[in-house]
Amino acid sequence: MAINTQDSTCLPLQEKIVHNNKTARAVELVILAFLVSMLIYRVVSFKDQEHSLPWFLALLCELWFTFIWILTVCIKWNQCSTKTYPDRLLKRLNEFEFPTIDIFVTTADPILEPCIITMNTILSLLAVDYPADKLALYLSDDACSPLIYYSLVETTMFAKLWVPFCKKYNIQVRAPFRYFTSKSSRFKDVSLEFQHEWKTMKNEYDDLYNKIEVASQRPFTFTCDHNSDFADFCDVNRSDHLAIIKVISESTGLPHVIYISREKNSQHHHHYKAGAMNVLTRVSGVMTNAPLMLNVDCDMYANNPQVFLHAMCIVFGHKNDQDWGFFEFPQAFYDGLKDDPFGNQLDNLYYVENGIAALQGPFYGGSNCFHRRKVIYGLSPNDKIKNGSIGNEDLHKVFGNSHEMRESAAQILSGSNAKIENQKSLSSLIEAAIHVAGCTYDYGTDWGKKVNVY
C-alpha cells in the first residue's frame, strides 16, 4: 500500500487563512435591509410631511450613518489572518541563506522610558533564534544620555551570558524581567545543572538591575574625564550636541550592537521619532546595509524567540518580493485585567486589522514592523533598476552627499547587496556614519519626502 506523503519543500511557508463569518454576514445583510427600507420610507414620505425640514435633516443623518456603516462592514465582511510555518523554513533553507536584518530600537528619555525596560527589550532581541552574524542592533538615544549608553554597555556584557543560557535551555520568554517573574521559570522537573545556572543568571540580572538603578540615581557616577569612554557626553545639551556613534559589540558571537545619538541643533527641527528613524536608516545603510529592517519601540520586547523565523516565512513565502513592502506583528500587553474592561488591550484593533488585511494590507502601526530597505528608499513595486543604471547625480540628489551612503543605496536598489560582503570593520565606518547622522544632512535631498519610514 502506497503512503501519500508531502515533500516539505512543496508545502507553503505561509498561508492566508480566511475566517468563517457566515453568521455575521447574515446579520449584516438583515441590518442593510432595514437601513435601505428606512431610507426608502424617508424619501417616499417626504412630500407628505408638514415638517419637511426636520424630516430632511433626519434623512441626511441616516444617509451619513448608512455610509459609515457600509465602510465598517467592508472591514468586517472578510476576516483573514496569516499563518506561518517556521519548522518548514528550517527544513528548506540553511542559515547562511537567511538575509541580514538591521534592528532599530528607539528611546528618547531615560526617565519617562526607564533604561531597564529598554535593556530588556534589547536582550529579548539579541537572544532570538536567528544567526547572530546576520543581525545588527542599533539603539537610537534621542536624549544623548550617558545613562542609556552605560546601560547598553552593561547589558551587552550581560547578554554574553544570557543569550547562551536562553538558547541552551530553549527559554521562551527572553526578556529577563518577565522571565524571572513568570511561573515558567519556576523549578519543576528540571536538572540540577539548570537550577544552578538559573540561580547564577538570576544573580547576574539582579546585579545588572542594581547597576542601572544606582547609576540613574547618582548621575555623578559619570565623571567628565576626557580620556574615559564617556568623554563624548561631557557638558552635552540633549537638544544641542554633535552626533555620537559607538560600536559596543562587533563579531563577538552576539549581533552587532551600535549606540547612536544623532546630532541636534536648536536651529534645526529634529522631527522627533521620524527624524530618528531616518538617521537610523542612513547610519545602518553606511555600516551594515541589511536588506531588511525591523523597528521596535523601547518597551516592546519580543515575546516569541522564533519571531524572526516567522518573519522569514513571509519573506520567502511569497513568489515575488514585489508582493510586500512591510509586515508587522501586533502589539500585546502583559498583566492586563481579565476581560479587558477598559479596552486598553487593543483587541478591537486586531479585529479591524484582520479585516483590512483581507482588503489590501494593514496600516503601519509604528512598531514591531519589518521593512524592505529598497521600499523605504523609494523604489515602488513596479520599478526595476538594473545594476549600473543608477546615475551618481541622481543618487546625490536623493540620498545626499555621502559617498558611502550613495554606494550602499545603489547596492540595495540594484539588488546586488546580497552578493557583496562588507569587508570593513564597523569601527572604521564611524566617521562616515557620523556624517549621515548630521542634523542638516537631509537638506536638499529626498529624505523625509520620498525616502523615509514616516
Describe the role of every protein-language-model region.
Residues 1-454:
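Glycosyltransferases that elongate glycans
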